[in-house]
């Protein structure tokens, strides 16, 4: 993937590196703990996920390295959520200065989530859509205080061993080769002190709950059910506090979105960006049809734990026939006729999940 590297200056003078690729409406990828614009692309899982998100270059992807990591300024004194929100602001303003767009969609995961929330709350006019994966609004929610302190201390004491230990949370299914690659990547993406400071901030000092009601843009919250770093309830609790949120629990235990089966994540993001109301996702000047989005408030989208459902969804083969019966005794076609959310979301996993939820509600009427 060709990726020109650009640099923007944050409000406190820190230089932030970012890359651009593709065309269309910008989707800003806000990384988690640490990142490296060049080394990330050497990870085949990351590259495949990014390639799928880019839609063959039809979607403009913007990636950044937060301060203290990757190609951005490494020697920094402050890595707080507030400062990382400044980093996002610098990149977005630089992007707006060089394109015909006046807003971006944001996809943030893990520790990048609180910074994206803080930025979107301060600049809602700059964010068309907000997508959050595997993140939280308040550090107290993860319930891993003792383990978190041990990891922070280990990383500060020995970055090589500490980076190895963290693999179990980022990608629990790693074999030795993947674990070795991650250790090399981590140690070349940030110093041990910065890595420890970032982890400590995320695990003990994050609280953006006061910003959530300021988020007026459509928001999608994704969370894997068996996430080993931030448990599922972190995403559920976050979504419940957002005024315009969809919550989509997904199968899997990997924390980073590009590990494990990322096809449902890519598909959910594509569906969300395509169906959310009132925003343009092509080149400047192109208009999208108005789809009549549902009113504000949390909508929970349910995937059932059917055997092989993930592979079927990623293969695009799980398309029930119009007469396929739901547990409520109604057909998908009959549910579609009565459910306005169905029309909003199109024939995709989000739509099918809403149909199941609607049919269950009808059983209780």
What are these regions (language model features)?
Residues 85-104:
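Conserved acidic catalytic loop of the alpha/beta-hydrolase fold
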Residues 142, 160-206, 210-211:
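Conserved alpha/beta-hydrolase catalytic His-Asp/Glu region
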Residues 228-234:
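Conserved alpha/beta-hydrolase "acid-adjacent" motif
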Residues 117, 121-122, 127-157:
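Flexible "cap/lid" loop of the alpha/beta hydrolase fold
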Residues 286-365:
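Catalytic NTP-binding/metal-coordinating core of nucleotidyl cyclase/transferase enzymes
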Residues 245-288:
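Catalytic active-site module of serine/aspartate enzymes centered on a nucleophile-bearing elbow/loop
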Residues 215, 221-223:
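Short beta-strand/loop motif that positions the catalytic acidic residue
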Residues 10-73:
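Conserved HGGG/HGGXW glycine-rich cap/lid loop of the alpha/beta-hydrolase fold
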């Amino acid at each position: 993937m060709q990726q020109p590297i650009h640099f923007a200056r944050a409000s406190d003078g820190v230089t932030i590196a970012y890359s651009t690729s593709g065309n269309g409406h910008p989707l800003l990828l806000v990384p988690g703990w640490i990142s490296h614009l060049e080394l990330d692309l050497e990870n085949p899982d990351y590259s495949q996920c990014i390639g799928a998100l880019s839609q063959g270059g039809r979607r403009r992807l913007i990636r950044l390295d937060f301060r203290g990591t990757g190609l951005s300024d490494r020697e920094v004194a402050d890595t707080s959520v507030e400062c990382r929100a400044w980093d996002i602001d610098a990149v977005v303003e630089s992007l707006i200065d060089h394109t015909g767009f006046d807003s971006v969609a944001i996809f943030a995961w893990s520790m990048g989530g609180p910074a994206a929330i803080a930025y979107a709350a301060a600049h809602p006019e700059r964010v068309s859509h907000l997508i959050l994966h595997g993140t939280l609004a308040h550090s107290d929610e993860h319930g891993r205080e003792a383990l978190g302190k041990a990891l922070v201390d280990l990383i500060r004491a020995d970055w090589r061993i500490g980076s190895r230990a963290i693999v179990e949370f980022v990608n629990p299914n790693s074999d030795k080769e993947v674990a070795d690659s991650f250790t090399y990547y981590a140690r070349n993406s940030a110093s041990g002190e910065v890595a420890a400071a970032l982890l400590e901030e995320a695990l003990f000092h994050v609280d953006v709950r006061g910003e959530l009601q300021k988020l007026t843009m459509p928001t999608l919250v994704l969370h894997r059910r068996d996430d080993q770093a931030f448990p599922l309830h972190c995403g559920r609790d976050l979504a419940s506090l957002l005024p315009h949120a969809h919550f989509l629990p997904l199968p899997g235990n990997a924390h980073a979105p590009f590990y494990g089966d990322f096809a449902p994540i890519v598909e959910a993001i594509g569906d969300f960006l395509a169906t959310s109301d009132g925003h343009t996702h092509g080149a400047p000047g192109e208009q999208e049809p108005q789809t009549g989005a549902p009113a504000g408030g949390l909508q929970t989208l349910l995937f059932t734990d059917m055997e092989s459902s993930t592979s079927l969804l990623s293969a695009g083969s799980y398309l029930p026939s119009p007469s396929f019966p739901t547990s409520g005794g109604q057909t998908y076609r009959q549910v579609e006729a009565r459910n306005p959310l169905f029309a909003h979301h199109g024939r995709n996993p989000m739509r099918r999940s809403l149909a199941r939820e609607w049919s269950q509600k009808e059983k209780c009427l």
